[in-house]
Amino acid sequence: MAAMAVGGAGGSRVSSGRDLNCVPEIADTLGAVAKQGFDFLCMPVFHPRFKREFIQEPAKNRPGPQTRSDLLLSGRDWNTLIVGKLSPWIRPDSEVEKIRRNSEAAMLQELNFGAYLGLPAFLLPLNQEDNTNLARVLTNHIHTGHHSSMFWMRVPLVAPEDLRDDIIENAPTTHTQEYSGEEKTWIWWHNFRTLCDYSKRIAVALEIGADLPSNHVIDRWLGEPIKAAILPTSIFLTNKKGFPVLSKMHQRLIFRLLKLEVQFIITGTNHHSEKEFCSYLQYLEYLSQNRPPPNAYELFAKGYEDYLQSPLQPLMDNLESQTYEVFEKDPIKYSQYQQAIYKCLLDRVPEEEKDTNVQVLMVLGAGRGPLVNASLRAAKQADRRIKLYAVEKNPNAVVTLENWQFEEWGSQVTVVSSDMREWVAPEKADIIVSELLGSFADNELSPECLDGAQHFLKDDGVSIPGEYTSFLAPISSSKLYNEVRACREKDRDPEAQFEMPYVVRLHNFHQLSAPQPCFTFSHPNRDPMIDNNRYCTLEFPVEVNTVLHGFAGYFETVLYQDITLSIRPETHSPGMFSWFPILFPIKQPITVREGQTICVRFWRCSNSKKVWYEWAVTAPVCSAIHNPTGRSYTIGL
């Protein structure tokens, strides 16, 4: 049968389905669709024109089977190759009570039969503003029984009536007409998934028409859980050789959908009758093969998209060998460090002193030695003499450093097994070098570590890095909201998972406004009273109707003069993959209207044993303060 099943785009192949409104012979049709290269078939579970009666006699008791037998296909084929479709006459939100009640019963009958067949997914239409009863019937179905189907809501990218020329002037306006026409369908979807309490089993099948909305509307859709994209054959153009192709704008949208690994569904009749129907699918394959290749960062991050990880706590915990190994593979970070040390050595030691002036370098938090090697390479490149101390608190990593020293470094490097804050240095350093930054700059306690070590830096000494700044940006992402919600632990407060940050490769999300600087730290810190607690207020203008789910955190650091590292999207160091962004979630999604401002308050707090963040949204509405007193998350000193 078909090569693949619903639910996965294996490798680089496009996963695709054929949408049909009527299937007289199911086994024959499935065979023909598979022969054309499609992986699954979308079809009605009941005959689309068979209106069942559930209320009135005698039609209510009409004899005979309601639909065809499940024995026409094997259980495996039902499980993997068929996506069910709701009959088009079912209208659970009809204002006519008889139609509504009949529709409710018919909808449950079809959903239950789909569950009985074990269908992997079921398509339901969202084609009007009010879908409240549809949401109730579906939610009740999800919460009863032990089935595991996904429910794909078929939502048009642009509402069909917005394309009509005959819209009646001065007609009474409905609620959603306070939104622009091209935003209507997103509002339908947002209200629907809110009514369904963000169920992970409800996703979007986005129907793409000939006309596309503006980029910000498309951007917002790409933060939604899109599982499928429905492409009508009518949107395809014809090239010189008679083959179906898409406009440049549509191609760009397809490239973005391919990144989300959506499945494509072709619907409609063959508009290119000289060509086989499979030519539509072949064109999608062609686009997939010719999309821009992934960069080094995307290749490294493959498989980690939207996967939540707890931030490392290298001060409190000793890292494992594999963790060091991953970070050491970064091609950019250490070359930037080498360049910074090289420049610093040239600035500190004039040419005429290069044979007599020996610079004392201390690598604080040496790990398995990558910064020591970068320092030695920089000294060689600059033709300057250095004396190195490699200070590391993890006794397991010290074994690696001592082996390096024995086999490679020799007496030029002194390995010190100690916490840098407690070490009594035999001399003062000209340069201290460290890589203590986390995804939010200071979240691995670089300020506390370097402040505790700066007493053994000379008065004119240099710290590499010399400065770092965290950044925040508001984001919308159903996927991440649901991932955080699923992190609930048995013995903790039921909302504790919303009061802690996560390191995550952001993928299925929409950034609502440009990142803004949050906290800045400089080294050496010459303040007479050093205090690393911080408080900032950030205001983000939002130009689109949307929903806020949390904040993405980034950082930039100045290693030395003009040598920098950054994970802020606008200035991201090309090819660097040592850090994924950080996510600060919020407990309750907040609806934001176009033109409103999101105001967030962020605190960095500490006591003698730990550091933590607190955060709260104060506009357009107030949230609770998250993580007060560090009750859900702290970073151990």
Swiss-Prot record:
GO terms for cellular component: cytosol; Golgi apparatus; methylosome; nucleus. One of its GO terms (biological process) is peptidyl-arginine methylation. PROSITE patterns: SAM_MT_PRMT (PS51678). The keyword Transcription regulation applies. Its main location: cytoplasm. The record marks F327 as: Critical for specifying symmetric addition of methyl groups. Signal peptide: none annotated. Activity is increased by EGF, HGF, FGF1 or FGF2 treatments, and slightly decreased by NGF treatment. Residues 488-494 are annotated as: Dimerization. Residues 465-637 are annotated as: Beta barrel. S-adenosyl-L-methionine binds at Y324, K333, Y334, E392, D419, M420. The modification N-acetylalanine is found at A2. Its EC number is 2.1.1.320. Residues 13-292 are annotated as: TIM barrel. The keyword Membrane does not apply. It catalyses: L-arginyl-[protein] + 2 S-adenosyl-L-methionine = N(omega),N(omega)'-dimethyl-L-arginyl-[protein] + 2 S-adenosyl-L-homocysteine + 2 H(+). It is an enzyme of class 2 (transferase). Residues 308-615 form the SAM-dependent MTase PRMT-type domain. It holds the Pfam family PRMT5. It is found in: Cytoplasm; Nucleus; Golgi apparatus. Keywords: Acetylation, Biological rhythms, Chromatin regulator, Cytoplasm, Golgi apparatus, Methyltransferase, Nucleus, Repressor, S-adenosyl-L-methionine, Transcription, Transcription regulation, Transferase. CDD domains: AdoMet_MTases. Belongs to the class I-like SAM-binding methyltransferase superfamily. Protein arginine N-methyltransferase family. Forms, at least, homodimers and homotetramers. Component of the methylosome complex, composed of PRMT5, WDR77 and CLNS1A. Found in a complex composed of PRMT5, WDR77 and RIOK1. RIOK1 and CLNS1A associate with PRMT5 in a mutually exclusive fashion, which allows the recruitment of distinct methylation substrates, such as nucleolin/NCL and Sm proteins, respectively. Interacts with PRDM1. Identified in a complex composed of methylosome and PRMT1 and ERH. Interacts with EGFR; methylates EGFR and stimulates EGFR-mediated ERK activation. Interacts with HOXA9. Interacts with SRGAP2. PANTHER family: PROTEIN ARGININE N-METHYLTRANSFERASE 5. This is Protein arginine N-methyltransferase 5. It comes from Pongo abelii. The gene is PRMT5.
